[in-house]
Amino acid sequence: MTVVIFLSVLLGAILLGVPVAFALLICGVALMLHLDLFDAQILAQQIVSGADSFSLMAIPFFILAGEVMNEGGLSKRIIDLPMKLVGHKRGGLGFVAILAAMIMASLSGSAVADTAAVAAMLLPMMKTTGYPLDRSAGLIGTAGIIAPIIPPSIPFIVFGVASGVSITKLFLAGIFPGIMMGLCLALLWWWQAKRLNLMTFSKATKQELCISFKNSIWALLLPVIIIGGFRSGIFTPTEAGAVATAYALVVSLFVYRELKVKDLYKVFLAAAKTTAVVMFLVAAANVTGWLITVAELPIMLTELLEPLIAHPTTLLLVIMLAVFIIGMVMDLTPTVLILTPVLMPLIEEAEIDPVYFGVLFILNTSIGLITPPVGNVLNVITGVSKLPFDQAAKGVFPYLIMMIMLLLAFVFVPELILVPLQWIS
């Protein structure tokens, strides 16, 4: 009965158009009434404690760093360097999009923000040079979902806080899978570009390449500082967010000089709005997560799937299928917040590496960002490209299949994630 109430209230509220955070609170109140636990003071305490975590402080810092980079010219220079490197090849703008998305992923950790930035800069150029708009939009959208995998990743921070898994290990574990995603996209785009009569650009001279590298070096140093810093123990992932923000501000204000002091209010306001949405969602989900634990739903799920515990690969396939279906209709962050407390006891019982599972889980929920009918990233590229939703979904489809195949490869061959993690660590 508890499961029925949980699902019916949550899904009913979402279908009625209630924002997810408020839907989670309504669901939490319904569960408290059902379990005869309702107390306004306890409800308030759970909401406050949900956002009361030192690790969560990284989220506003990385969001602010992303806003500063977009306004301060770092994003523009990041795209210019791949343009000079591979823009002259057949289908070069596609490779530029992939490279730019990977570099920007290592700066902000937000799929929606990275996709919007890359699409706004490259899609008009791809359209005027004769690239198929649906495939181009699909490629950029899929490249955008690399952001939650390559550190610094906001979804990894959320998962780490919800599960108790080391955020530093999650960050390091995401590096190789993120690179693999980029390589697979580049391979598929190369195969597609061979069959298309696409316009090519003149090859950049060594002087132009040097100038572009010189202009972008300050932006490229940021991921090196962040990853090198928390890997060597100089600072934690949370402190890395503050370092990223400070670095982006200094470079934008005093090196590139594209960000003016008068623009800071607008930048901070945009970051504050985005942060408020995410943190309220985290706080609301804590109420539901607490009640899920009190109602012993994780124990019930463990008992239900007990025959599969001895077969970790089969268990992971079942979980990944369920997460994929849920990810089709729910955004990444609420999916992570709702399912993590339910799934982690099962993962521990099956003795599956929690860091490995975290990478699979976030990759799967990231795929949901480009999967109809919801797909937030899919909506972004639809808006930027002005394509009908069905055409954008058609453009994403081959890359979506590629990402699903890569996810399955990681499920069947855990060493693809665990061995590089050992090397990096």
Predicted regions and their residues:
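Alpha-helical transmembrane segments of multi-pass membrane transport proteins
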Residues: 1-425
